């Protein structure tokens, strides 16, 4: 889990647009972020496996 101070800091609007860093909206993780879902890979996998994300299904071939 991310520090509360880092999550609050990332929610503020940066002085320059280039300073913006995406964070997972669920856990606050800054790395392995999927823009389409606004989640990190760990939360995406967790919520997709229990069917919380519409349109995402487990792949099989």
From Swiss-Prot:
Keywords: Metal-binding, Ribonucleoprotein, Ribosomal protein, RNA-binding, rRNA-binding, Zinc. One of its GO terms (cellular component) is small ribosomal subunit. GO terms for biological process: translation. Its cofactor is Zn(2+). Signal peptide: none annotated. It holds the Pfam family Ribosomal_S14. Part of the 30S ribosomal subunit. Contacts proteins S3 and S10. Binds 16S rRNA, required for the assembly of 30S particles and may also be responsible for determining the conformation of the 16S rRNA at the A site. This is Small ribosomal subunit protein uS14. It comes from Pelobacter propionicus (strain DSM 2379 / NBRC 103807 / OttBd1).
């Amino acid at each position: 889990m991310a520090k509360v101070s880092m999550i609050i800091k990332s929610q503020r609007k940066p002085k320059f647009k280039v300073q913006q860093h995406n964070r997972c909206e669920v856990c606050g993780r800054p790395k392995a972020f999927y823009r389409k879902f606004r989640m990190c890979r760990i939360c995406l996998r967790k919520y997709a496996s229990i069917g919380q994300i519409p349109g995402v299904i487990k792949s099989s071939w």
